[in-house]
Amino acid sequence: MIQPQTILQVADNSGARQLMCIRVLGGRKRYASIGDVIIAVVKDAIPNMPVKKSDVVRAVVVRTSKPVRRDTGMLIRFDDNAAVIVNQEGNPRGTRVFGPVARELRDRQFMKIISLAPEVL
């Protein structure tokens, strides 16, 4: 459950470390969950990388602390809120994804992120 002003960790090697959500895309949605696209600002970044501090970027939420209920009745919850920075077409800007990602990304057609992730839960 990500809303504006929420701080997220970055789960890729694009150069950003922390993001702050400033808008949830997709109509009049108040909260973003796993697989939703948000607009965020980079709050912390690694020097000499493509993504700089204070850049406004699009990102896909890949992990949330709020439990997500699946159709089978199982709840899945992660330790942190994390996102992967993507371009306008939905392809990741980094070349690696760190940490596990949720299977719900497959339903939202983010196959490139799924293929880069070391573990899909």
UniProtKB/Swiss-Prot annotation:
UniProt xrefs under Gene3D superfamilies: Ribosomal protein L14
Keyword set includes Protein transport: no
Gene Ontology annotations for the cellular component aspect, listed alphabetically: chloroplast; cytosolic large ribosomal subunit
Origin: domain of life: Eukaryota
Record's subcellular location: Plastid, Chloroplast
InterPro entries in alphabetical order: Ribosomal_uL14 (IPR000218), Ribosomal_uL14_bac-type (IPR005745), Ribosomal_uL14_sf (IPR036853)
Keyword RNA-binding annotated: yes
Assembly and interaction partners: Part of the 50S ribosomal subunit.
UniProt family annotation: Belongs to the universal ribosomal protein uL14 family.
Name of the protein in question: Large ribosomal subunit protein uL14c
Taxonomic lineage from the root: Eukaryota, Viridiplantae, Chlorophyta, Nephroselmidophyceae, Nephroselmidales
